[in-house]
């Protein structure tokens, strides 16, 4: 037990006596003045309140000016519009957002939409910036094969912005420009590319006339190869098969041989030939002189290629040739990711293979409880019959979340209407809507069978909830939903020769709060894959001196198109078994002529094995002639749903090696209303290991006008075990001007069990100059349960140059309910070197509005407080006499004396302890 010291030596003792004396005198003088001449207590002190409130309102107004969340509206500028591309699946995420998002490519623009009073359905704020892949389409030749090349690049969209009016999602309230503007912000969008160009509609081509004999027994296939055996069909992935063939005997015009694909593969991809006798034309096999050696077709139903020889072979022997053909997934027969048999029969010779489909998951959206989630795929495009139709599958709410006021927009374009051939209208579009019983049974390939028992058609329930009020947009009002839906789209495109680009968007709110607006989108587009072959033979005139035919030179597939999307599937570049150059016309060399929205002549030989999940929305209309040879083997799995729109001007050189074990489930709804003009040049080396489980309910309204100049040299080595139960009712109005230059190295282990109920109303006008160099090694065990009712309005302008090295291990279990009424206006210039490890969860003051969370860190302050105080100010009462100042001075002197006495007693109490 420590010995009590009543009197300290020298300075401290004298200082204590002097302060005690001054306090007593102040009480006496203040009481005399107060009771002698202070009789005008009826006069209202509205001036000080106005001043205080004005400063608060000014701060609030400034904060409001800088941090207000502008909820985008329908009338967003056209510059913000950007849509999602078609069979290149590109997810516009908001990101949220991340998208969601802003997408920087052709998916969505990142500029925030201009906002008006009421936000409209699709105008949204940008939350996260993500790069979206821009797929380049390849011009189509007469005999080209098409698949839906899907490239998913999920980009988060703005999702966390609040809706001021939950009805802003209602389509009837939106303007035509709104839908495109919704894309202009950071919507997540995913692109799918179908390998084709709609520049020229293919004529209806019947199967090659096979009037002759099946000569499979006279044809020998060799050097069979698959360009790759693993790919992602939803990311525009496909493979090529290449083979040589030799005719071992004489054949004549009309004779033919065949090749047959297994169930897991198709030769037509996502191109629909059902209106063209289910027959797809294949590029002719030509000789090196350009003569047609064989014509080829592909039967969609039987999955059989037929190669019919022309009269070129009538006088030829030793006919050798090769072919290279693109292969695609069969979405109906291979609906899930996995490995399938891929046994291919060429001229009755079986080549056994395995092929693995790694479908990108169609379950995509904003990663939060009420985040919008949607995806789509173009699964069939009619390019041959002239009917110009396409089929699209849309998964709505595949994450099966509880969503409110849900809208889905199906668009026939992405960024601009004039850049797509898609047509969405009541006459051009047929929609069927199905409710999903078991979401886990949805296919990975986007194939949906209307007769599947897992799907329940509910189209009739949406008859009055489908709108075509905006150009090239179908809007579906789903409302409050908890289930997953499948929308089957049968649409049309025009003959303008432009690529078919579509986009789907979902937006919704939290059904409980009608806030927390979320939006997510998905793009689809089409590109082309080419196939062909070559062959030659010797003349029968000189059988003894045959000219050897060219060995197989498989048709090179298109070079990989640079696509800054996640998991870009390198485009096929198969050249197995190189042979003499086949006729260039027969090779249908599709390495060039990339009809890319980006206008890029990129002769780029890029081996990009990049598994990048980068949600990039790149709107790059860059006309760049880049001859780049890049071997980038980047496995970047960056699912960066970075919703960080942080506008932080912090000149802080913080070397924070913080090993923070902060089990602080910091519910810091820190919609940080920090309109603090703090010039903090803080070099903080904080190695903080803080295990703080703090439940603090501090409702503090502090008006602290403190100007304190404290020069204190305190070396305190205190080991205090304080179990203090203090009930203090103090009302403190402290006007203190504090200039404290304190260098404190405090290694404090404090275990204090204090139960303090402090209702403190203290009016303290203290001018203290304290220069404190305190080395306090205090071991205090404090378990403090403090109920302090403090109302503190603190207008603090702090210029703190703090170099804080805080190595504090604090285990503080504090339950503090502090309602303290302190009026302190503190102008503190504190140069403090503090080592602080704090983990606090603080509830904002009662009289200040809590700002909503914003992904950009913007806070929406309200200036209603200022207006209200101006309106509700108390009328002036009483006489404005000259004695008012004397009364106030007396009261302040009395309170100052009380405060000094109180501090003296508190010091005595500590010394006794």
UniProtKB/Swiss-Prot annotation:
Residues 45-542 are annotated as: Ligand binding A region. It comes from the Bacteria. Residues 1-44 form the signal peptide. It is a peptidoglycan-anchor. A motif (LPXTG sorting signal) lies at residues 874-878. InterPro entries: Adhesin_Fg-bd_dom_2, Adhesion_dom_sf, Fibrogen-bd_dom1, LPXTG_anchor, SDr-like, SDR_Ig, YSIRK_signal_dom. GO terms for cellular component: extracellular region. This is Clumping factor B. Proteolytically cleaved by aureolysin (aur). This cleavage leads to the inactivation of ClfB. Residues 878-913 form a propeptide. Residues 96-119 have a biased composition (Low complexity). GO terms for biological process: cell adhesion. A motif (YSIRK-G/S signaling motif) lies at residues 15-26. Cell surface-associated protein implicated in virulence by promoting bacterial attachment to both alpha- and beta-chains of human fibrinogen and inducing the formation of bacterial clumps. Partly responsible for mediating bacterial attachment to the highly keratinized squamous epithelial cells from the nasal cavity via an interaction with cytokeratin K10 (K10). Also promotes bacterial attachment to cultured keratinocytes, possibly through an interaction with cytokeratin K10. Binds mouse cytokeratin K10. Activates human platelet aggregation. The keyword Electron transport does not apply. It is found in: Secreted, Cell wall. Belongs to the serine-aspartate repeat-containing protein (SDr) family.
């Amino acid at each position: 037990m420590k010995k009590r010291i009543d009197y300290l030596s020298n300075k401290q003792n004298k200082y204590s006596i002097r302060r005690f004396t001054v306090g007593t005198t102040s009480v006496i003088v203040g009481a005399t003045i107060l009771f002698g001449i202070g009789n005008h207590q009826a006069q209202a002190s509205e001036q000080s309140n106005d001043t205080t409130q004005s400063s608060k309102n000014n701060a609030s107004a400034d904060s409001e000016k800088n941090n207000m969340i502008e909820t985008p509206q329908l009338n967003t500028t056209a510059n913000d519009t950007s849509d999602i591309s078609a069979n290149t699946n590109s997810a516009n995420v908001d990101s949220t957002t991340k998208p969601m998002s802003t997408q920087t490519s052709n998916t969505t623009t990142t500029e925030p939409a201009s906002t008006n009073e009421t936000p409209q359905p699709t105008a949204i704020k940008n939350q996260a910036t993500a790069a979206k892949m821009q797929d380049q389409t390849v011009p189509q030749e007469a005999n080209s094969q098409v698949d839906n090349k899907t490239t998913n690049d999920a980009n988060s969209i703005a999702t966390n912005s609040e809706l001021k009016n939950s009805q802003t999602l209602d389509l009837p309230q939106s303007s035509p420009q709104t839908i495109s503007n919704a894309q202009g912000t950071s919507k997540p969008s995913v692109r799918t590319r179908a390998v084709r160009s709609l520049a020229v509609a293919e004529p209806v081509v019947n199967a090659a006339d096979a009037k002759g004999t099946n000569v499979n027994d006279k044809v020998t296939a060799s050097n069979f190869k698959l360009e790759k055996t693993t790919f992602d069909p939803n990311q525009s992935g496909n493979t090529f098969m290449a083979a040589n063939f030799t005719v071992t005997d004489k054949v004549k015009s009309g004779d033919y041989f065949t090749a047959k694909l297994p169930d897991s593969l198709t030769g037509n991809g996502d191109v629909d030939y059902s209106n063209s006798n289910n027959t797809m034309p294949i590029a002719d096999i030509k000789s090196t002189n350009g003569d047609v050696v064989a014509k080829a077709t592909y039967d969609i139903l039987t999955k059989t290629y037929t190669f019919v020889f022309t009269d070129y072979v009538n006088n030829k022997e030793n006919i050798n040739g090769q072919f290279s053909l693109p292969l695609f997934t069969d979405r109906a027969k291979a609906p899930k990711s996995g490995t399938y048999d891929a046994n291919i029969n060429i001229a009755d010779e079986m080549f056994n293979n395995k092929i693995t489909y790694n479908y990108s998951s169609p379950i995509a959206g904003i990663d939060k409880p009420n985040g919008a989630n949607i995806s789509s795929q173009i699964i069939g495009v009619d390019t041959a019959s002239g009917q110009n139709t396409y089929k699209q599958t849309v998964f709505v709410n595949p994450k099966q979340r509880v969503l409110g006021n849900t809208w889905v927009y199906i668009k026939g374009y992405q960024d601009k209407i004039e850049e797509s051939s898609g047509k969405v209208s009541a006459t051009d579009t047929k929609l069927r809507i199905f409710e999903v019983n078991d979401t886990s049974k949805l296919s990975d390939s986007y194939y949906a069978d209307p007769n599947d028992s897992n799907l329940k058609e509910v189209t009739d329930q949406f008859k009055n909830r489908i709108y075509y009020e905006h150009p090239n947009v179908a809007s579906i009002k789903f409302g409050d939903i908890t289930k997953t839906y499948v929308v089957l789209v049968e649409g049309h495109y025009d003959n303008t020769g432009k690529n078919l680009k579509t986009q789907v968007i979902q937006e919704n709110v939290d059904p409980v709060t009608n806030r927390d607006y979320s939006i997510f989108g998905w793009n689809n587009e089409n590109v082309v894959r080419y196939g062909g072959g070559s062959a030659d033979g010797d003349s029968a005139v000189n059988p003894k001196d045959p000219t050897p035919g060219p060995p197989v030179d498989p048709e090179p597939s298109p070079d990989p198109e640079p696509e800054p999307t996640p998991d870009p599937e390198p485009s096929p570049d198969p050249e197995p078994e190189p042979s003499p150059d086949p006729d260039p016309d027969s090779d249908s060399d599709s390495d060039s002529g990339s009809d890319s929205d980006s206008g890029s002549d990129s002769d780029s030989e890029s081996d990009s094995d990049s598994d990048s999940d980068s949600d990039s929305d790149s709107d790059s209309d860059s006309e760049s002639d880049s001859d780049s040879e890049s071997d980038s083997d980047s496995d970047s799995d960056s699912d960066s749903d970075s919703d960080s729109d942080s506008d932080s001007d912090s000149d802080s050189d913080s070397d924070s090696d913080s090993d923070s074990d902060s089990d602080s489930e910091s519910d810091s709804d820190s919609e940080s209303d920090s309109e603090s003009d703090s010039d903090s040049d803080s070099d903080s080396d904080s190695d903080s290991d803080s295990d703080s489980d703090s439940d603090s309910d501090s409702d503090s309204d502090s008006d602290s006008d403190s100007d304190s100049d404290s020069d204190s040299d305190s070396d305190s080595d205190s080991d205090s075990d304080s179990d203090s139960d203090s009930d203090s009712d103090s009302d403190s109005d402290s006007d203190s001007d504090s200039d404290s230059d304190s260098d404190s190295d405090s290694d404090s282990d404090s275990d204090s069990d204090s139960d303090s109920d402090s209702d403190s109303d203290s009016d303290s006008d203290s001018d203290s100059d304290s220069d404190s160099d305190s080395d306090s090694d205090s071991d205090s065990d404090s378990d403090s349960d403090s109920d302090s009712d403090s109302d503190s309005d603190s207008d603090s302008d702090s210029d703190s140059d703090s170099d804080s090295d805080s190595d504090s291990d604090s285990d503080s279990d504090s339950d503090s309910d502090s309602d303290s009424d302190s009026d302190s206006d503190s102008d503190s210039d504190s140069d403090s070197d503090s080592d602080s490890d704090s983990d606090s969860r603080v509830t904002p003051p009662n009289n200040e509005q809590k700002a909503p969370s914003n992904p950009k860190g913007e806070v929406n302050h309200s200036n209603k407080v200022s207006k209200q105080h101006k309106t509700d100010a108390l009328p002036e009462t009483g006489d404005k006499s000259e004695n008012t100042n004397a009364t106030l001075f007396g009261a302040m002197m009395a309170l100052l004396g009380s405060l000094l006495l109180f501090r003296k007693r508190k010091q005595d109490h500590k010394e006794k302890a």
